[in-house]
Amino acid sequence: MNRTNKDLFEQYALMGKALSNSNRLEIMSLLIQAPKTVENIAKETELTVANASKHLQTLLKAHLVKNRKYKNYIYYEVFDENIEKLLTLFFETAQEQLTKANAIIESFAQPSEEEYILSIEDLEEKMQKNEIVLVDVRPSEEYLTAHIPGAISMPVQELEKRIASLPKDKEVVAYCRGPHCLMSEEAIMILEKHGRQAVRFSQSVNDWNLHHVAI
């Protein structure tokens, strides 16, 4: 193998190494939703600002993220659409493998016996028939960045106060950042507590977009 190829593989390894850390993977899972400041990232990941900044510098060097200044803040975002697709596929594949192993996921979020898997095709069919109301329970800035068409923005922290505005004659489908995110699980608990029929859509906006690019 020539030197050029070795150099390329060293660059590939740099990217792989940058992702071989649970904190950095969590940061990337946030950034594929919307650009965020170091302070936002630190708060959502429960890291110190200094530690979050250090992880972001590693991701910058690996060309996985980029930053831009807006007013007095520096925002970090996924480097480009290809990195977003790569991460979406990675999280989706990892989730499938973990589900097959039936170990970590059970300790992370135990589904109810009544829960069923709602596919993208199922969701589209229900939306076309006007059978459901789709609720995006992520923070509002993530909804504004990208959301599933037809979804209503209702952050999980606001859900209980706004639940009366949801139609009572329709099933509520809640989604958040994907299978690793528990905000939609919390939303289902709140909805069911108020006597609403609700189900979780475990896939993300990125999964939705990737599905429609593929067909």
PLM feature segments, named:
Residues 2-10, 88-130, 136:
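Amphipathic alpha-helical dimerization/coiled-coil segments
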Residues 53-54, 185:
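Conserved catalytic core of two-component sensor histidine kinases
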Residues 43, 60-61:
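Alpha-helical residues within the helix-turn-helix
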Residues 64, 166-209:
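Catalytic cysteine-centered active loop of the rhodanese-like fold, especially the PTP/DSP P-loop
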Residues 124-180, 186:
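Positively charged, proline/Ser/Thr-rich regional signature most characteristic
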Residues 11-50, 74-79:
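N-terminal helix-turn-helix DNA-binding core of bacterial DNA-binding proteins
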Residues 56-57, 74:
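Short, hydrophobic-biased segments on the C-terminal half of alpha helices
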Residues 61-70, 77:
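Beta-hairpin "wing" of winged helix-turn-helix
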